[in-house]
């Protein structure tokens, strides 16, 4: 009884922080003609309510795709339509065709913020609570502390409740998928993850680990018996869920193709804006976006992404385990973020979710990563006038992690899950006994650099000849950190010889 009382308090704390952040500015507030993501979400409500389904993804006089045209899968459009019906009931002016463009008011802001909170309450927060309650071999106190830290992760709060998006929906469905598969409810887990992909196509970052883990399970059961039956059932679930989600758009071939063109805009190029991945960082030294033809950029990004995630995926197929599954989710999502085509700065949230899931296992490294992930979005958050909420929520999250997990005491090779790797290295370099000390120093350097760059960005004006200097530095420093984490998580995956035994049921 006490556990549920404390968990309720944790949820209320998470909701309070979310609503407090929502009182601040949002993307594109008072900035015509394009405004920002807030207007994009409102505009999608306008389009889905006033136009027939067949026109949602097509350019027309009533639906200018250059002005925040729909570029997410059908379930996102259905969600917008549902919100539009509620908006119509409250104030029809909010979704009036054409005349509502750029609509802003305190009442409308309250409505929009409430839709995010309701989605969070229905999908993401219950998944977090259940996940933490299902963790094995840790105390009730640690389960509650884990839930608190996950719910206080500033990156997701600042983007959904500050900038304005509905990332908690797709991430929540993905988490339900992780829960289902980790508890051997493979069909329900697969259904939940299909809903995640069909809500936001960026959930493809997590698709390979789901596929490899389930395939490994099928191999383990035997493809001539129970494994084959499971494989057929999984295939039926995937096909059925996609057909149901896309049914209105399967009536005509051109409808399906147009939606796909909107979901995967290859014409936009390798990257947009300032994002903390390899291509944007490397572009500072060599303008690969201008030098290489677009099809070469596409092939290059595919090759780098595929090669970087291959070892983890092979290991997961050969040795399927819940622990390996979660770490492979981190590794694959990070590979996609660093090397894939058309990455946005907010896509780092797709890496942050699985990192949150291993917070209780490697608290020091997880906390560090989640701090860097929030810092990597600094240029976007400053543009949205969210500096103060960013600082306060980041400090609150850091304090929660330090007090809950004593992270500075969890830096030994064993706590960092690097003991097997260190033993292997010491066979050739007996003097290699300082790995944990190196990581502590790297953490210190990383945090100091992030603090200094934040202060410089806020207090100093960039040189006239280099107006994007601080934004580029933020991306470059974040990218270096992410490369280090990619190596680290792959080391854990490859050198983990106990993934199939002595593991926790969920964690």
UniProtKB/Swiss-Prot annotation:
Keyword check for Chloroplast, yes or no.
no
Q: What does this protein do?
A: Dolichyl pyrophosphate Man9GlcNAc2 alpha-1,3-glucosyltransferase that operates in the biosynthetic pathway of dolichol-linked oligosaccharides, the glycan precursors employed in protein asparagine (N)-glycosylation. The assembly of dolichol-linked oligosaccharides begins on the cytosolic side of the endoplasmic reticulum membrane and finishes in its lumen. The sequential addition of sugars to dolichol pyrophosphate produces dolichol-linked oligosaccharides containing fourteen sugars, including two GlcNAcs, nine mannoses and three glucoses.
User: Which Gene Ontology MF annotations are present?
Assistant: dolichyl pyrophosphate Man9GlcNAc2 alpha-1,3-glucosyltransferase activity
This protein is called: Dolichyl pyrophosphate Man9GlcNAc2 alpha-1,3-glucosyltransferase
Location relative to the cell:
Endoplasmic reticulum membrane
In which family does this protein belong, per the annotation? Belongs to the ALG6/ALG8 glucosyltransferase family.
Q: Which reaction does it catalyse?
A: an alpha-D-Man-(1->2)-alpha-D-Man-(1->2)-alpha-D-Man-(1->3)-[alpha-D-Man-(1->2)-alpha-D-Man-(1->3)-[alpha-D-Man-(1->2)-alpha-D-Man-(1->6)]-alpha-D-Man-(1->6)]-beta-D-Man-(1->4)-beta-D-GlcNAc-(1->4)-alpha-D-GlcNAc-diphospho-di-trans,poly-cis-dolichol + a di-trans,poly-cis-dolichyl beta-D-glucosyl phosphate = an alpha-D-Glc-(1->3)-alpha-D-Man-(1->2)-alpha-D-Man-(1->2)-alpha-D-Man-(1->3)-[alpha-D-Man-(1->2)-alpha-D-Man-(1->3)-[alpha-D-Man-(1->2)-alpha-D-Man-(1->6)]-alpha-D-Man-(1->6)]-beta-D-Man-(1->4)-beta-D-GlcNAc-(1->4)-alpha-D-GlcNAc-diphospho-di-trans,poly-cis-dolichol + a di-trans,poly-cis-dolichyl phosphate + H(+)
| Gene symbol of the encoding locus | ALG6
Q: Which GO terms describe its biological process?
A: dolichol-linked oligosaccharide biosynthetic process; protein N-linked glycosylation
Q: Where are the transmembrane segments?
A: 4-24, 115-135, 144-164, 173-193, 227-247, 298-318, 324-344, 362-382, 388-408, 438-458, 474-494
The alphabetized UniProt keywords are: Endoplasmic reticulum, Glycoprotein, Glycosyltransferase, Membrane, Transferase, Transmembrane, Transmembrane helix
Q: Is Transport among the key words of this record?
A: no
